[in-house]
């Protein structure tokens, strides 16, 4: 296997091992988990087992006929919200990935309908679960075998209209939850941070969603939303930092991906390792997906989270409790390390990670790498020019993953330690592009110009 180097990488940065000093000054880097565990999350003592993921998938299937009725764009798929697993040979070549390093595929959540991002998975699931609970409690659904299309009828909408669903968001989660909640008739409120893009706020308002703007960052928007919800017994707050329902909604993507891999003839085993690169904000989406994949593939899947260099909250949480960060307590933020949480990747601009997601993935997460904004725009432009993928900056964080794994000393040491070096030619690399479908044309054009200028 040859070492590869991303078009965005700098040799001096790529050759070094992880260091806290490099993290604190915002250098792009790779951190490999020191002890990936063979004790994977489907053990009897785990609070989240594969049966929970199966039940989540069953719930999404029960709602599919209703979703097909509510959203014409879902009719062809029978109400199932899913993205394609796409070959990307031109992008692989542009990323300097020779054939002996494996095959690159793109999980195209940037094109997911309704929300246009990965947040359609977890966010919509939690809204549907809450609607199901209310409908069962009030006798609108006799059982899980009922026809869920009754939830589009006036009686159900009258019930839902007396209840509120709220969320704190930098943008995409708010879009997913706001659009779905409003479509069912709920009062929908989205608390948005200063990082949120104006077009996302306008898209919500046009769908009847109340947008509450906050001057602070993501964490402050979530805290404000949580406090407001606690004062209203009829308000269900979708808590991105603590929600098991969200996490399971994301985890339900794993069995679907497994079926797509089988359909494409891609094996995953000791001789055919699977590497997955997932953009990470608070951690719920990549955490849920990593959980689901680990339940299916065990030690043969290697999930790496991607974060902005100035907002690496999940990596900071992974380092919590180490001697270097022990003085910061159990739940440190990027501010504690002197970082400013400023990035064009609005969906990843999070100062403090979800403790729930961190503890779920800690036993099996392969690693975390960081990417600067310049590289995000460069890779966004590369995805467009090679494959025609229309992604937003946050989604582009997944694309430097192979280079960070195979082109850094830290990444190569991980491959050597896990005895993967001689299996790379038969490996599969999945870059999970997390959003972009609904980015306005003028905004996307600016992204492309900035990416072209840095290429």
Swiss-Prot record:
Alphabetized UniProt keyword annotations: Lyase, Plasmid, Pyridoxal phosphate
Enzyme Commission number(s) of this protein: 4.3.1.18
Residues modified as N6-(pyridoxal phosphate)lysine: 119
A GO biological-process term: D-serine catabolic process
Cofactor(s) the protein needs: pyridoxal 5'-phosphate
Domain of life assignment: Bacteria
Transmembrane segments annotated in the record for this chain: none
InterPro entries: D_Ser_am_lyase, Ser/Thr_Dehydratase, TrpB-like_PALP, TrpB-like_PALP_sf
Keyword Transferase found: no
Reactions listed under catalytic activity: D-serine = pyruvate + NH4(+)
GO molecular function: D-serine ammonia-lyase activity; hydro-lyase activity; pyridoxal phosphate binding
Family membership noted in the UniProt record: Belongs to the serine/threonine dehydratase family. DsdA subfamily.
The protein's name in its UniProt record: Probable D-serine dehydratase
Native source species: Polaromonas naphthalenivorans (strain CJ2)
Lineage: Bacteria, Pseudomonadati, Pseudomonadota, Betaproteobacteria, Burkholderiales
